[in-house]
Amino acid sequence: MSAPITLPPVLERYELKYMIPIEYVEPITDFISLYCSLDYHSETAKADNYFYSVNSLYFDTPRYEFLKQRIAGQAHRVNMRARTYGDGSKPPYFLEIKQRMGIPGVVRKYRATVADEEWPSLLTDPNFRIADTDSAKERANKELFLRLAISNAIEPKILTKYQRRAFFSTVDEYVRVTMDANMQYRKQDDYALVSTYGMTNYDNETIYAVNTASDANVVLEIKCNIGEVPQWVLSLVNLFELKQQAFSKYATSTLVSHVDNGDWFMSSDRKSRHSFS
């Protein structure tokens, strides 16, 4: 069994996203098995077909400035979230900032580990102080998260949950492949990192389709060092005729759940027949 892969506190990488039907999951798994191994979380989720739960609580300003920047296609923007894995009942939890760098596909990711006794007091207690036991990089990332949280007056907005099968390359310095399925969301105004009720399944024709109905309901993401896309990744894209597509779980969930059922930003043939109330 592989050891847990620990992401560095700051990671700058190139991210490629594709929408695929669930039927592609196993063939793609077979293809990349020559170059990749399951990550620790997937390897320990054999009973669930190597899919594990990812729970993310997304934050935004009171007037949704992060979302507005995303919709406007602003080149330099940030996304802030707290994340936990599995059932979310125990730490570690993670604070994450994803910063778009002005270059298509290039993302800088800041991450800090949060202990049980720190959550959610680090965001709700004005007297909270970062522990001296944190490493210098962890401390710097927590301080950055808190500065942005205070200056933007961030609030919990959306909780998402999905099942992920993840891989890491065994032949490259850094390549990570993830496939996210069974995605759910709910509006959230507190700091709970998981929910057992009120989660809405992503509706296929509303969420995933582009201008028409689609069988795509899984998000495939390939992450690698900038300027180092391996040949096997290009072969994967060509073999399965994958088309790169932007997809934001936060933006999609928020638009559909908060803004007129998403009608104002979707073309008429993408409107859902289902209720998102």
Across the structure, where does each feature detected by a protein language model lie?
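Phosphate-end processing signature that detects enzymes handling 5′-triphosphorylated RNA
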Residues: 1-277
